[in-house]
Design a protein with these regions (language model features):
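Conserved catalytic motifs of ABC-family nucleotide-binding domains
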Residues: 175
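Catalytic Walker B motif of ABC-type/P-loop ATPase nucleotide-binding domains
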Residues: 179-182
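Helical segment within the ABC ATPase nucleotide-binding domain
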Residues: 194-206
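Conserved ABC ATPase "signature" region
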Residues: 132-150, 198-201
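The feature captures the beta-strand-to-loop junction immediately N-terminal to the Walker
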Residues: 56-58
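Conserved ABC transporter NBD signature motif
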Residues: 79-86, 99, 137
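Conserved ABC ATPase signature
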Residues: 154-158, 162
Length: 210
């Protein structure tokens, strides 16, 4: 439960082959207190490989705070975050990312003056890969997300749906085990929402926890 006055729930699309050994994320009684009030009051969550879990609830229920505690942007007052059998409660965000926790923020995070492929290559350059490996990985992501035709376009010219495809592609550069999506359909037109939904479903089929 999150916030005694306004609880939220976790809606889950399970993986048919999930087992206990495939548990990717567990939260144990997470609590966050602001101004003497528990805005998050003991949330438990379990996410396995190949599962999609969504946090549902009204505004002010504590969804964003819970999300931030999981990715490492906010430190809980009590409780634990277990990621791939490691207690990461005290880990900063970058250490969680190194373990395979991907994060796609609601706010636009692309480099607007760079091209689509430059945006992907910029993230790839942070990895210990050769130039050829970076190029191949970039081409693979461009193809996977159907953005090859706009690879040379600057990011500021993209539609909402194209930007979302690019941001998801960038978040997968490090090949995470878990992808945290904050309002993934925000700023996306209704027609493109379906395309983004299909991308998420396909990622789930590949075994990614979402």
């Amino acid at each position: 439960m999150i916030s005694q006055a306004a609880p939220i729930s976790a809606r889950k699309i399970p993986s048919p082959a999930a087992t206990k050994e495939e548990m990717v994320l567990t939260t144990d009684q997470l609590v966050k207190i602001y101004g003497g009030r528990a805005v998050v009051d003991g949330i438990d969550m379990h996410v396995r490989a190949g599962e999609i879990v969504g946090l549902l609830g009204p505004n002010g229920a504590g969804k964003t705070t819970s999300f931030y505690m999981i990715v490492g942007l906010v430190r809980p007052n009590s409780g634990h975050v277990i990621f791939c059998d490691t207690d990461v409660t005290d880990f900063p965000m970058y250490k969680r990312a190194r373990l395979g926790m991907g994060y796609l923020p609601q706010e636009e995070s692309i480099f607007r003056k760079m091209t689509v492929e430059q945006n992907i290559l910029a993230i790839l350059e942070t990895l210990p890969l050769s130039k050829t490996e970076r190029r191949n990985r970039c081409d693979q992501l461009l193809h996977q997300f159907g953005i090859e035709r706009i690879a040379k376009n600057t990011a500021l010219t993209l539609s909402g749906g194209e930007k979302r495809r690019l941001t998801i592609a960038r978040s997968l550069v490090t090949q995470p085990k878990l992808l945290m999506l904050d309002e993934p359909f925000s700023g996306v037109d209704p027609i493109a929402v379906y395309d983004v939904q299909q991308i998420i479903v396909n990622l789930r089929k590949s075994g990614l926890a979402i």
